[in-house]
């Protein structure tokens, strides 16, 4: 697939989710929430609260952006040292696993439940008929009960580290591409570093800044493609 097609899809997906994020930042759609979890008669509780409309609107972005970004990184990695490029790409692919699991988890909850109907007693429901009524939901909730292995937490924890490592590796990749194309090298490395910092140290509305950075990177690549000629072709065909 041509770079122009890939980057255009990334740009449209990011512009779309930026609009969605701005809408929900203003409070749009937050009057209807889904609350799933448990509370114990002996103390303690665990809940997950989601906005169904946001989950459904975010789904097309998740599919489109991560698919085409993976294709984009696959093109970028071949222009540097094979070991570095492959390591960065593998780390990126590993980081997608928790994103996929969380997306399926969120879609399952908002499509199966309404309001707070599934915020129920641990002893009187989830540890009895809840196990058979909603086995997938119990699998997710049980990881947060007592001393059980919190596999969801571990998955997200190591997934975040893989994502940070992938961004760091690709920051180096883009920095090495500076000699071949200054605009791509600077824009790519900057977006990777900003993504690392705002993921490690979240700020209010930091995700808006990340969206804007990716839009800037896509715009820079499309601009360089437009300038490309037979004599001076762009580094990414």
Regions found by a protein language model. Name each.
Residues 2-236:
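Hydrophobic, aromatic-enriched alpha-helical segments typical of multi-pass transmembrane helices
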């Amino acid at each position: 697939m041509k770079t122009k097609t890939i980057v255009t899809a990334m740009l449209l997906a990011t512009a779309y989710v930026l609009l969605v994020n701005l809408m929900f930042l203003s409070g749009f759609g937050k009057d209807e929430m889904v609350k799933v979890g448990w509370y114990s008669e002996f103390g303690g509780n665990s809940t997950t609260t989601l906005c169904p409309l946001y989950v459904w609107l975010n789904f097309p972005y998740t599919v489109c952006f991560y698919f085409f970004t993976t294709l984009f990184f696959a093109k970028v990695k071949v222009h540097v040292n094979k070991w570095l490029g492959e390591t960065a790409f593998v780390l990126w692919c590993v980081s997608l696993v928790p994103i996929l699991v969380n997306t399926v988890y969120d879609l399952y909850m908002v499509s199966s439940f309404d309001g707070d109907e599934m915020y129920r007693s641990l002893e009187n429901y989830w540890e009895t008929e809840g196990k058979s009524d909603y086995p997938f939901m119990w699998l997710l909730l049980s990881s947060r009960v007592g001393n059980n292995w919190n596999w969801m937490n571990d998955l997200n924890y190591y997934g975040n580290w893989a994502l940070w490592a992938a961004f760091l590796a690709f920051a180096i990749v883009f920095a090495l591409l500076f000699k071949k194309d200054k605009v791509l090298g600077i824009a790519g490395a900057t977006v990777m570093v900003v993504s690392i910092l705002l993921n490690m140290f979240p700020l209010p509305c930091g995700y808006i800044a990340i969206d804007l950075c990716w839009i800037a990177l896509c715009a820079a690549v499309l601009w360089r493609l437009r300038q490309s000629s037979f004599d001076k072709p762009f580094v990414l065909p």
